[in-house]
């Protein structure tokens, strides 16, 4: 994580034996640097507008693969983590809003499990590691909920989903599964300093993995080697999990937006699109770089398209700040793409506005400019970034990574972390489909054929929105620095 390891230091002094001393308070790895679970719980309660009630969440449970005795890879429920900071299975959590008490319930000690896979989390250990008021074993959960409910005329427990109620038989309890999710989504949209540090650290590891790939790409023969080098670097730095499946797409595979086979020979393919990001303490990074296998562009076409996407990204990032509509930046990216593709002769026969309205630019840039990043790589928010407020751009669809769609386009707020990931692609299926549509009159298919071997170019960074601008959290080299890194 970024930031100083020292919270404060005392005055220097001398002990009775004449030895000098100084005291430094270290915050890393101590109670002063815990994940801020209680503040998150308070924020959610405030968002709910409540002064009383009980929030209940359950962690992901231990599971085995279908028809197997092998464990399913564990991935913590993100809403549970947001209110606990706990990355352990089979736990439960309550937050008593009125009393401001956050309680974790952990599994009983299991000797057999301790022998085979190691001991489970104990209450005393949980209190040391996490920002809690209390930690107890699971057998106390039912009793404690009953005690809490007995002191209230109309006790209401707030849960995420109908199927995630605590295992308690009490007819007098009311469960609300409608309000908690949107309240948590609203809170998760804005990241605090601790969360930003986690995303920053995930980006640091991802940057070093991207650099390692660039350093070795000249001698790699297969997409699988790219995948392996990236993963190896992340794991060796403590990031065992990826935020999403690694995309190591060479040549025309780079035109497949979520290509994950990663098993084809590199041969004479012009470019590699590597979309890969490490996860750190459940927080994601999302980074894409597109590069040649040598420290120079293998063709005019590849250099041209990289330059187009680079301009799209730079101008959109420079436009980020609080109060800006992200949708407007998405439309700006399309305008830049159209201007540049017109100059290259790929688009033709219309003005920038005419082509934008036709939707022809979507053939080459078919996805949204970006999304929120946080506990999910496509993180939650109460309103999707890519919602349209007007039906002005009929050719551009409602582009959103997550439902629900809305007719109110949101404005950026300080504390949001968003990706900026424009791309230009030459997808054979997309081009074949375009030939049958009226928008084909704006596309010079003969010129396009020269660009097919480029496949696709995407450049993606994770960017923190601030009150007066932005901070780019992604440090992986791009452009000239990227080419210099290839040896």
Curated annotation (Swiss-Prot):
Annotated stretches, region: Disordered: 1-22
EC number from the UniProt entry: 3.4.11.9
Annotated Mn(2+) 2 binding sites: 275, 286, 460
Cofactor binding note from Swiss-Prot or TrEMBL: Binds 2 manganese ions per subunit.
Chain intervals with Polar residues compositional bias: 1-10
GO biological process: proteolysis
Short name of any one Pfam family annotated for the protein: AMP_N
Enzyme class: hydrolase
Listed InterPro entries: Aminopep_P_N (IPR007865), Creatin/AminoP/Spt16_N (IPR029149), Creatinase/aminopeptidase-like (IPR036005), Pept_M24 (IPR000994), Peptidase_M24B_aminopep-P_CS (IPR001131), X-Pro_dipept-like (IPR052433)
Cofactor(s) the protein needs: Mn(2+)
Molecular-function GO term, any one: manganese ion binding
Keyword terms: Aminopeptidase, Hydrolase, Manganese, Metal-binding, Metalloprotease, Protease
Residues that, per the record, bind Mn(2+) 1: 286, 421, 460
Catalytic activity: Release of any N-terminal amino acid, including proline, that is linked to proline, even from a dipeptide or tripeptide
Family membership noted in the UniProt record: Belongs to the peptidase M24B family.
General function of this protein: Catalyzes the removal of a penultimate prolyl residue from the N-termini of peptides.
Protein known as: Probable Xaa-Pro aminopeptidase CPSG_02684
Source organism: Coccidioides posadasii (strain RMSCC 757 / Silveira) (Valley fever fungus)
């Amino acid at each position: 994580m970024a930031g100083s390891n020292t919270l404060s230091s005392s005055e220097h002094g001398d002990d009775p034996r004449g030895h000098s001393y100084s005291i430094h308070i270290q915050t890393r790895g101590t109670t002063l640097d815990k994940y801020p679970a209680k503040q998150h719980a308070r924020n959610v309660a405030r968002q709910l507008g409540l002064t009383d009630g009980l929030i209940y969440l359950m962690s992901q449970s231990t599971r085995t693969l279908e028809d197997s005795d092998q464990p399913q890879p564990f991935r913590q429920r993100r809403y549970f983590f947001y209110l606990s900071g706990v990355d352990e299975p089979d736990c439960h959590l309550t937050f008593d809003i009125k009393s401001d008490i956050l309680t974790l319930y952990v599994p009983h000690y299991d000797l057999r499990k301790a022998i085979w896979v190691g001991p489970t989390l104990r209450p005393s250990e949980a209190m040391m590691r996490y920002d809690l008021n209390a930690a107890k074993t699971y057998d106390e959960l039912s009793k404690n909920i009953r005690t809490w409910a007995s002191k209230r005329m109309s006790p209401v427990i707030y849960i995420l989903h109908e199927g995630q109620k605590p295992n308690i038989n009490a007819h007098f309890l009311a469960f609300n599964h409608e309000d908690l999710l949107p309240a948590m989504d609203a809170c998760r949209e804005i990241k605090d300093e601790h969360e930003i540090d986690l995303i920053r650290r995930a980006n640091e590891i991802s940057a070093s993995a991207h650099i390692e790939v660039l350093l070795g790409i000249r001698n790699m023969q297969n997409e699988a080697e790219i995948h392996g080098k990236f993963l190896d670097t992340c794991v060796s730095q403590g990031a065992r999990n990826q935020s999403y499946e690694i995309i190591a797409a060479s040549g025309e595979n780079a035109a497949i937006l979520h290509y994950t086979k990663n098993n084809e020979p590199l041969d004479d393919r012009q470019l590699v699109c590597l979309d890969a990001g490490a996860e750190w303490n459940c927080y994601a990074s999302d980074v894409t770089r597109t590069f040649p296998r040598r420290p120079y562009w293998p063709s005019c076409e590849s250099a041209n398209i990289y330059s187009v996407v680079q301009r799209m990204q730079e101008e959109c990032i420079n436009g980020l700040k609080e109060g800006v509509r992200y949708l407007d930046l998405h439309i700006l990216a399309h305008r830049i793409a159209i201007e540049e593709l017109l100059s290259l002769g790929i688009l033709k026969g219309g003005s920038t506005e005419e082509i934008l309205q036709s939707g022809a630019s979507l053939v080459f840039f078919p996805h949204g400019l970006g999304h929120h990043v946080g506990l999910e790589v496509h993180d939650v928010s109460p309103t999707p970034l890519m919602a349209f407020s007007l039906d002005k751009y009929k050719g551009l669809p409602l582009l959103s990574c997550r439902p629900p769609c809305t007719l109110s386009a949101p404005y950026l707020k300080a504390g949001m972390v968003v990706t900026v990931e424009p791309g230009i692609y030459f997808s054979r299926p997309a081009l074949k489909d375009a030939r049958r549509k009226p928008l084909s009159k704006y596309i010079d298919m003969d010129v396009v054929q020269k660009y097919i071997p480029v496949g696709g170019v995407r450049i993606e960074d994770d960017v923190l929105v601030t009150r007066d601008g932005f901070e780019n959290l992604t440090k992986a080299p791009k452009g000239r620095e990227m080419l210099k890194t290839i040896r």
